[in-house]
Each structure stands twice: as C-alpha cells, then as structure tokens.
C-alpha cells in the first residue's frame, strides 16, 4: 500500500497554548506528510468534513490525529477500514501533564508525533481472518438447570444449539431437588420446580438438538471452527460449532473425609443431598431404624471454609439448609430444628427466609462443631463452641444430623495434566496453568485437554477483567462449574454464558477479536522460514492459541487468538508480527526518538506502557493535572508480554538512558487483561542482566513496575524517582553513537 499521509493537529483543549503547532507541522514535513492542518476544534463537524474531503479529493489514506488520547473520541475519529489511522496523544500525555511553553514540553510533543508517524508508516490495514466453513452453532455441555437454560436461551435467540448430557435423562442435580428457595415476595415460601416443564420447553424448541447418555470425546479446532466428536451408545457423531458453554456443574464434597464430624459412624449422620433425595421420594425417615424424624440438626460449612478440605465458601449451602429446615417446619411446626453455623450467608432477599425461620422457632447456634456423638439412647448429640458465650455447649439429643457439604466443580475432578518440560537452555518459565484431565471437553490443545482452573479448580478467569470468560477463547463456563452459586444465580449465569457464546460467534465470523481487544481485526502472522522450533510461542500463549505439528513447528489458530502479542514478545527470532503491530515497528519508533547528546543534560527515558492499565493511568494523571518528568517518552504496547527484548537493546543502543516497563499487577490477584503477560515480562527481565552485561551498562537503567488503573496518583512519583535514579547513573555511554 503506497501511503499518502495526512497529519491533523488539534490546538484545542489547551494543546495550542502549551505546544507550538508550527513546530509540530515541521515534524510532519520531515516525514513527507502530503497534508498537514491545524484546527482548534478537530473533533468538530467542520474539521471532520475537511479530513474526509482530503481522503476523497487528495487521496489521503494514512491519517495521524494529533490531539486527545486514543482512548477517547473513538466514534468521532472513525474512518473507512482501508485507511490507516494513528492517534498521537498530545493532550493527556503532553499538554495536560507538562508546563506550557517549555522547551522540554515541545520536545516531548515532537517525539510523540515522530513516533506516531513511524507507527503509521509501519502499519497496514488489517485483513480479517474469515473462513468459508465458519459455524455459528452453540454447543452446551451438561444438561442440568444451567445447561438447559443456556441451550434454550441461545436457541430462542436464533442460534442452532447442541446439548450434550452424560446421563440418560436431563436435569442433572435438580433431578433430585424437592423444592427451591423463594425468589418472589415475600421471600418466605418455598417454590416448586417443574423439571418436566423445562424439559418439554427444550424438546419443543426446534433449534435445539439433544444428545443424552453421551459425552464429548474430543474438541479440535477453534472458535467458529470447533470440530466436536460426540460419543453416544458406542457410536460417534461429528458436529462443527462456533462456541461452547461448559455447564457440567459440581458434585458435593466427599463427606467420608469429614471424620471430625463423625460421618460414617452413624447412618443418621447424612448429607444435605441425601436429605433432598428423601424429601423428593416422600420417604423422610431415620436411616438407622426407619422411624419418623422427630428432631434434626444441620451442621453448616461441613468441609467448606476449612483449609483442610474446601478453603472457599460454597455459597449456596446456608440457603439450602434454611430451605431444608423449612421442609420440617412446614411438615410439623413442633419439630425441633437446630442449625449450627459459622456465619449465615443469606444474601439479598434470602435474608427474609432466614428471619422467617427464626419466627418459626428454629434454634441457631453460632460456633464451630467439635463433635457429633451417640448419646447412648439411639440418638445423637452435637458439641459446639458457642461464639456468643465463649463456652462449649452440647445440644439436645436429635434423631438426624444433616451435614451441609460444599460443592466441588467437575473441572476439579481428575488427574493433573503433565505439561511438557521446557527445552534445555530455555528461560525459566512462568508457572503453568493448573489443568486436570476431567474428561469434560477433551480439547486437542497443545497446552492441555481441559480449561485451566484457578486456585480451587474453578475454570473462571479474573472476575473484573474477564467476566464470563475462560482462558480458552470461545469456551464459556457457566453455573457451579464456574463458581459456587445457587439455582437462581445459575440460571442467570447460563444466560450470560449463552450471550458470550453468541457474541463470540458473531465477532469471530466477522474476523474480529473478542474481549479484551474486542473488534481488532489483526492477527499474528508467522514467517516460518526463520522458525527454530524453540516452542516459546506455543508454551507461553496464555490462551492456548498455538498448537504444534510433529516437528514442533507452531500451528497458529487465528480465531483462538486474543491479539495480546505475547507470542511476538516470546519469539527470539522475531518471526511473529501483526499488520499493525510488530517488533520492527516498535523498534523503529524507539529509533526515531530525538536523543540529545550528553552535554545537553536532557536524559531520555523510554516508557513501554501496557494499554490496559498503565496507559489509562497515565491518561488519568494528565486529566488530574498531575505533572511528571518531561524526559519520558511513552510507547503503548498491547501487553507487557508482547515486549520483545530486542526493544531493550534497541533503546540502549540508541542512547536512551533508562527504560521503564509499566504494566498490570501479576500474581494470585492478577489484573493483567491477558492473564500472565505481565508475569511473563517480569520473568523475561531475568535476561536483561545478560544484555546489560554485554553492553557494559548498569542494570538500574531498566526497571519494571506494576500499577493498577487506579494508581494514577502514584504515576508522577514512580516516574520522577526513576528519572532521578537514572540521572544519578550518568549518561548512557552509547549516547551519540
């Protein structure tokens, strides 16, 4: 594409008072811009009309908007997709954070424009990846309440849906549920659940195809091109689908492990699931002797919130126990009912059910249960630490003890997947994702056959950065396999996952990325002639987007890709690039920075800022009128994981005095939009020492800092402290070479 460049400089919003537009026009002239205009109201209708006229009459096809942050006015500065657009941030990151009229302020603006022009020249319009055999079908795995709801809602939205259930009948956990907690005012009365009605609705929906007594034998391919093998009654069927909802639910925690609660010592110590089955079957009797239950005690958090068992709260157990206590009070208001609890977590309107049970005479005892024993007369007594009195107490004798066991996601069942060991000499890897071979999806992915799980085995992702997401593009867990939740939440979760699946097939079929770079039409391209089969890209991709062939060559799957560029940062041969983002592009942007010689005493600091948290924080610092060191030159990157170490070498060779990597927080409470890009960058920094030793430079010249988007008020001190440290080291000895 032969480029004809138009540069449009805004002098409004204080930019013109802070920076000389004529000096910026001169920079545009240095880069052979065919058109250069300055306007006090560049986002106004008249100015936009002039830009469009230049496109039509002057043949401008590459546009630089030197004005406000690229994070704003995206709908205003929106040009045809065959035009290349570059936004240069003169407002938030120059005019609003630097003193007006200063030489350093102008030099910062000039470098920002130079870098923008280089990026523009290196960019090409993205060509979306679109295949002829894309599918928009939705596969739902799991035929319980969540799965049936997801399938029904997706079909009602007009999408063909395939539902796979391992049992012969649909329903999952709710097949054995007697009644449900209240969801309507006055939130005191339990509600009936008609599974047959939901099943009938599903059966009558023409867009739903149901496989029962079946399992997913394998899933290969990528979003809109998932090839699914479904095994049923010894036969195998093939389906091509666009996205997958995983709704395989959870199972109760194994009560046999609860020896401290005497499970297994008496048949009258049962689980909440056992009691639900009793009520469903209409036969609620003591297992020991078949007599009616005259009194009952519930022990909450049986295994949950316990570091020896399930460290987390299972969310629904409290309300389930309140519901079951209500069963007894409805049958006979005189039945003694005890509930032993740590905390009653009856959120929202469930609090009204809790209050109703207090009115019904249920006795609540707050404290940890220390023992359940036979009283010698064929009944049970519970010993507990009473939080209110600080003393141990013993309950009245009861006929039945119900343990409210927690929930374990089906994704947490199975043996750990063994990750291939890194090649000898490879850098220390970031901790691998925890994947268990649970036989839910059987993915044909290089990084493992199932969704990666978080700390407790739930295949969720960061709840702020990735709502409803997983670490595998196009696969959305829902219901209790995603997180602990109750029936009502599971139904809502099913609809959310169905909507995400629909969003995915629509975006991918148009050649666009999904969250977080939603709408991006670029994708990584591989120059295979230089590939050394080092496996760095296949191992480090956070989303499992790259498989390998038998010779360890990377096999990219463009529709799995989230466009983070982590593979680009990983590649030592620099064979991976995007149409609008490449190693050479950023390297040339660094090389275009004007670096004064050492006698001018104007050091230059390169800031590689993650576009997701760090760059917005820099914007917010400017919006808040906070000033920081004028030696800083900011280049936004898709993710710190996309930073290739050659950029560090380029910057130091250029004479840049210090390099600062500003990215998202990593670790257990990570905030990286690409999961572990920031962590990967931190790991790669271990190689920087080797580079600096080779260049005979101090290691303090390169630093990485983690910031949240809310840390904008800390930005000035962070940058000023770094500038002070670099200044104390003296000029980069490569300056001027």
Locate each region found by the language model.
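Residues forming the flavin
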Residues: 1-603, 615, 627-640, 657-660, ...
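C-terminal functional segments of enzyme domains
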Residues: 365-367, 707-737
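Active-site core of glycosidic bond-cleaving carbohydrate-active enzymes
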Residues: 610
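Short, surface-exposed acidic-centric catalytic microdomains
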Residues: 621-623
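Thiamine diphosphate
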Residues: 642-653
């Amino acid at each position: 594409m032969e480029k004809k460049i138009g540069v449009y400089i805004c002098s409004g919003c204080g930019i013109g008072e802070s920076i000389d537009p004529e000096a910026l026009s001169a920079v545009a002239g240095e880069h052979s811009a065919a058109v250069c205009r300055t306007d006090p109201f560049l986002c106004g209708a008249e100015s936009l009309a002039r830009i469009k006229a230049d496109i039509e009459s002057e043949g401008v096809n590459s546009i630089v908007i030197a004005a406000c942050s690229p994070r704003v006015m995206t709908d205003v500065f929106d040009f045809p997709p065959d035009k290349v657009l570059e936004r240069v941030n003169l407002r938030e990151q120059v005019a609003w954070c630097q003193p007006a009229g200063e030489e350093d302020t102008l030099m910062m603006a000039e470098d920002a424009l130079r870098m923008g022009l280089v990026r523009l020249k290196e960019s090409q319009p993205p060509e979306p990846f679109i295949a002829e055999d894309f599918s928009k079908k939705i596969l739902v795995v799991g035929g319980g309440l969540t799965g049936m709801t997801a399938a029904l809602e997706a079909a009602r939205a007009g999408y063909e849906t395939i539902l796979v259930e391992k049992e012969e009948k649909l329903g999952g956990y709710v097949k054995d549920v007697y009644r449900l907690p209240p969801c309507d005012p006055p939130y005191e009365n339990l509600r009936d659940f008609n599974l047959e009605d939901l099943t009938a609705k599903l059966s009558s929906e023409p867009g739903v195809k149901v496989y029962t007594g079946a399992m997913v034998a394998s899933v290969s391919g990528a979003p809109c091109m998932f090839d699914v093998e479904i095994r049923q009654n010894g036969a195998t069927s093939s389906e091509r689908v666009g996205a997958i909802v995983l709704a395989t639910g959870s199972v109760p925690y194994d009560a046999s492990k609860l020896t401290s609660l005497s499970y297994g010592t008496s048949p009258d110590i049962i689980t909440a699931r056992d009691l639900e089955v009793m009520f469903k079957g209409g036969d609620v009797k003591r297992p020991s002797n078949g007599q009616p239950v005259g009194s009952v005690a519930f022990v909450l958090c049986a295994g949950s919130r316990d570091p020896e068992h399930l460290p987390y709260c299972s969310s629904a157990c409290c309300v389930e126990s309140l519901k079951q206590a209500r069963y007894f009070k409805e049958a006979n208001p005189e039945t003694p009912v005890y509930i032993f609890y740590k905390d009653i977590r009856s959120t929202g309107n469930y609090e009204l059910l809790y209050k109703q049970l207090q009115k019904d005479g249920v006795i609540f005892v707050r404290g940890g249960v220390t023992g359940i024993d036979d009283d010698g007369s064929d009944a049970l007594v519970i010993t507990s630490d009473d939080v209110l009195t600080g003393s141990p107490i013993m309950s009245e004798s009861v006929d039945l003890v119900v343990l409210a066991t927690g929930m374990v996601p089906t994704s947490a069942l199975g043996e750990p997947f063994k990750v291939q060991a890194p090649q000898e000499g490879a850098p220390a890897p970031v901790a691998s994702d925890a994947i268990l071979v649970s036989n839910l999806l059987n993915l044909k992915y290089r990084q493992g056959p199932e969704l990666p799980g978080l700390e407790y085995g739930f295949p969720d992702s960061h709840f702020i950065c990735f709502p409803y997401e997983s670490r595998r593009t196009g696969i959305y867990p829902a219901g209790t396999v995603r997180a602990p939740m109750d029936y009502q939440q599971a139904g809502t979760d099913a609809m959310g996952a169905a909507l995400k699946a629909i969003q995915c097939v629509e975006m991918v079929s148009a050649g666009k990325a999904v969250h977080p770079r939603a709408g991006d039409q670029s994708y990584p391209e591989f120059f295979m002639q230089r590939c050394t089969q080092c496996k760095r890209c296949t191992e480090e991709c956070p989303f499992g987007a790259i498989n390998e062939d038998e010779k360890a060559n990377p096999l990219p799957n463009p529709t799995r890709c989230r466009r983070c560029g982590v593979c680009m940062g990983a590649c030592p041969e620099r064979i991976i690039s995007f149409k609008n983002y490449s190693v050479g592009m950023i390297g040339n942007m660094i090389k275009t920075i004007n670096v004064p010689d050492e006698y001018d005493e104007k050091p230059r600091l390169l800031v590689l800022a993650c576009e997701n948290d760090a760059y917005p924080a820099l914007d917010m610092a400017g919006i808040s009128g906070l000033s920081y060191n004028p030696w800083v030159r900011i280049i936004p990157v898709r993710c710190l994981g996309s930073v290739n170490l050659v950029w560090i070498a380029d910057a130091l060779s250029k004479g840049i005095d210090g390099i600062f990597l500003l990215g998202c927080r990593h670790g257990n409470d990570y905030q990286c939009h690409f999961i572990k890009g920031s962590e990967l960058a931190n790991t790669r920094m271990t190689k920087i020492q080797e580079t600096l030793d080779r260049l005979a430079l101090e290691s303090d010249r390169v630093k990485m800092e983690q910031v949240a988007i809310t840390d904008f008020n800390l930005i000035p001190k962070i940058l000023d402290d770094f500038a002070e440290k670099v200044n104390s080291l003296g000029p980069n000895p490569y300056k001027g070479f």
